[in-house]
A protein has these predicted regions:
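Membrane-interface segments of envelope glycosyltransferases acting on lipid-linked substrates or membrane lipids
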Residues: 1-258
Length: 258
């Protein structure tokens, strides 16, 4: 199992990168089955000969689609809790406060959104080492009344009901669940073009470069208020992102039936 090398300390990154290269070289001699959540993540983790072998399986990150019912009333309740008007634009991001999540760019995007629509709010769900840094950026921009730091949230699906559009301008990701969850709920999501195209399951997901916050803000405004809810869960299930399907597939891998 692996996860991204997400650390802004140069020495730690250097050491972890070195260990990754060594581990990647040794994998064919130590492991007999390879499972990746996306093609991009697999290419980072496994040597090419492992991916091309019969022992490699692509098993997408999956969710329990039954939990993702769109509930407008629940969304309004969440907005009322934070004194957010019914007609306001709510932009959301879910993720740890670490360098790879690119929170400074998120703040730049939201500042541009506010120029076009002052009746806008930003939900930031998650916690981490860079939270205080991001809070300082928000305070410096004098938009503290527009940005809500929620910390770790157990009921993310409930909070997402109040969000109009999700953004994920990460520097890199494997296959982010939030992109799947957003589309399952019928919420448009913008993701960076550094993320695997495998997250684009429906027309709700748009990829953008992470060098122009104005472009992101323009895309957000172009989608706000124009999204007619469509239940894409059947399509998402067909594409293999339902947890029931994924569980059965991994059971078969363990039993040697695949």
């Amino acid at each position: 199992h692996s996860s991204s090398i997400d650390d802004n300390r140069k020495i730690v990154r250097f050491l972890k990168t070195g260990l990754h290269k060594v581990g990647r070289f040794l994998l064919p001699y130590l492991v007999d089955t390879y499972i990746g959540c996306s093609t991009k993540a697999s290419e980072w983790m496994f040597p090419r000969k492992c991916i091309d072998s019969d022992s490699y399986y692509l098993l997408h990150n999956a969710i329990d689609l039954d939990l993702y019912d769109r509930n407008i009333n629940l969304g309004l309740e969440v907005r009322q809790k934070f004194n957010i008007p019914k007609d306001a634009l709510v932009v959301g991001h879910i993720g740890r406060f670490t360098p790879v999540k690119n929170h400074s760019f998120i703040i730049d995007i939201f500042k541009e959104v506010l120029k076009q629509n002052p009746n806008s709010y930003l939900f930031l769900l998650g916690d981490g080492v860079e939270r205080h840094k991001v809070e300082s950026l928000v305070k410096l921009a004098a938009i503290s009344d527009k940005v809500i730091f929620m910390g770790y949230v157990n009921n993310t699906v409930e909070v997402m009901q109040a969000i109009d559009i999700m953004i994920l301008p990460s520097l890199f990701e494997g296959l982010p669940l939030i992109a799947i969850e957003s589309q399952a709920l019928g919420i448009p999501i913008l993701v960076s073009d550094t993320i695997t195209q495998e997250v684009v399951l429906t027309d709700l997901c748009t990829t953008l470069p992470i060098d122009n916050p104005e472009q992101w803000a323009h895309e957000i405004m172009s989608k706000f208020g124009k999204n007619k809810y469509i239940d894409y869960r059947s399509r998402i299930k067909e594409l293999g992102y339902d947890s029931c399907v994924a569980i059965k597939k991994i059971e078969n891998i363990y039993k040697g039936k695949q």
